[in-house]
């Protein structure tokens, strides 16, 4: 009996401790704790932090005192009340306040606000390629529409024969990076290929991304020839000096070279998006470098009828196609000259420009995310005679 009596206080003590713990735990719960509802579009591209669109259920009018009190009761500040096209309002609130508002049964939905921008249109673009990449199907409509900010803030590195940076179509947005042919800081173009490519990327008249910056990295001589060592040196320079967000275009290639492919992969891993020409041999792109690099965006060519020309390489290595026959762009002959050329060299810079458009609105996107967005946004089922294993995807520029 004595043992039993001595145990009771201990049991009581244990019980008291448990009850005290429970009491403390209950005391730590905030008095204002409330369920959190779902915020639609939270964190989506272009979302506006702290701004939400609220739609109310039919039983509560947004313009009524009850409607106003509903939002304000959760700490949200109404910035605009709708009453005709939408029974709701725009509010300023933090994420917790918005979540509590979304959980209220009188609220139909809470959607995070997003930014909207103009689509700018160029009438009668000088290149049919521009006309094609903003339309999911033929016929062409003699217009090219692109989203602002038109590639502003994005740098595109043209690893090529150099660029005539003084050409008027660049409007002061092109500069020299490095010349690995003559080993100096003036990467001028004595061939014309690089200037033509740069014009497709970012020319004011001829370009896809009309406000992107161009940096010339010369790795090919005036005859359009160079060594793998020079190309790798150019890629190495871009990787070390890239001003991000950044895109690099390689409208060049040769037979498979493990070192060149590794250099491109390493540069992509550093955060630079690469667009590369599939090649003009009319064979499998997988046989050539850097077209065979899986992490790069490899581009085949199409003509005005959405057909793959005989010269364009093909195969599963390709990510998509873009215009590449009789493409008009800037010429290195003078500061106002233009020329028309064909090749996957012309197709790839269309995609580089589209990548710049995307990065201007998604500045933290990784190269893989950029590639995925371009592939997903491409028009499917349009390319005729695309070649064994090739994807049936044709470039479309991102829309605002």
Residue ranges and their predicted role:
Residues 2-119:
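Primarily auto-inhibitory N-terminal propeptides
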Residues 123, 224-231, 252-322, 326-352, ...:
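Substrate-binding/specificity loop regions of serine endopeptidase catalytic domains
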Residues 34-42, 46, 79, 212, ...:
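C-terminal subdomain of the subtilisin-like protease fold in secreted/lumenal serine endopeptidases
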Residues 35-45, 68-81, 86, 102-155, ...:
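Protease zymogen maturation seam
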Residues 52-55, 90, 109, 155-159, ...:
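Structural recognition of the beta-strand scaffold that forms the well-ordered cores
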Residues 143-176, 184-230, 242-247, 286, ...:
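Subtilisin-like serine protease catalytic core
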Residues 64-67, 71, 95-98, 130, ...:
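Extracytoplasmic/secreted envelope proteins and their assembly/folding machinery
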Residues 58-61, 85-86, 96-98, 114-118, ...:
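Solvent-exposed loop/turn segments at secondary-structure junctions
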């Amino acid at each position: 009996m004595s043992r039993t009596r001595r145990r009771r206080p201990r049991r009581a003590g244990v019980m008291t401790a448990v009850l005290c713990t429970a009491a403390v735990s209950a005391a730590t719960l905030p008095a204002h704790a409330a369920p959190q509802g779902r915020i639609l579009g939270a964190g989506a591209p272009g979302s506006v932090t702290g701004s939400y669109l609220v739609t109310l259920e039919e039983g509560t009018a947004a313009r009524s005192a009850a409607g106003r009190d509903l939002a304000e009761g959760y700490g949200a500040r109404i910035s605009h009340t709708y009453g005709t096209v939408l029974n709701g309002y725009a509010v300023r609130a933090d994420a917790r306040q918005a979540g509590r508002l979304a959980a209220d049964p009188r609220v139909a939905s809470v959607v995070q606000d997003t930014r909207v921008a103009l689509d700018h249109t160029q009438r009668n673009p000088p290149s049919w390629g521009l006309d094609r990449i903003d339309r999911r199907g033929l016929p062409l409509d003699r217009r090219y529409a692109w989203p602002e900010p038109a590639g502003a803030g994005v740098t595109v590195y043209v690893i090529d024969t150099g660029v005539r940076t003084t050409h008027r179509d660049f409007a002061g947005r092109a500069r020299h990076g490095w010349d690995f042919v003559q080993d100096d800081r003036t990467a001028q173009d004595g061939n014309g290929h690089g200037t033509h490519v740069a014009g497709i990327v970012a020319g004011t008249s001829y370009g896809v991304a009309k406000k992107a910056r161009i940096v010339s990295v010369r790795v090919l001589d005036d005859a359009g020839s160079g060594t793998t060592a020079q190309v790798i040196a150019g890629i190495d320079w871009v990787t070390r000096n890239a001003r991000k967000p950044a895109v690099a275009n390689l409208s060049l290639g040769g037979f498979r070279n493990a070192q060149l492919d590794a250099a491109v992969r390493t540069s992509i891993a550093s955060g630079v998006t690469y667009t590369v020409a599939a090649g003009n041999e009319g064979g499998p792109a997988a046989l050539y470098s850097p077209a065979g690099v899986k992490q790069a965006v490899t581009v085949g060519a199409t003509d005005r009828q959405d057909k793959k020309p005989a010269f364009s390489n093909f195969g599963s290595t390709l990510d998509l196609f873009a215009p590449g026959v009789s493409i008009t762009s800037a010429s290195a002959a003078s500061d106002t000259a233009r020329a028309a050329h064909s090749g996957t060299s012309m197709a790839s810079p269309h995609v580089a420009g589209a990548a710049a458009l995307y990065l201007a609105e998604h500045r933290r996107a990784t190269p893989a995310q950029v590639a995925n967005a371009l592939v997903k946004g491409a028009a499917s089922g349009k390319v005729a005679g695309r070649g064994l294993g090739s994807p049936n995807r044709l470039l479309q520029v991102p829309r605002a």
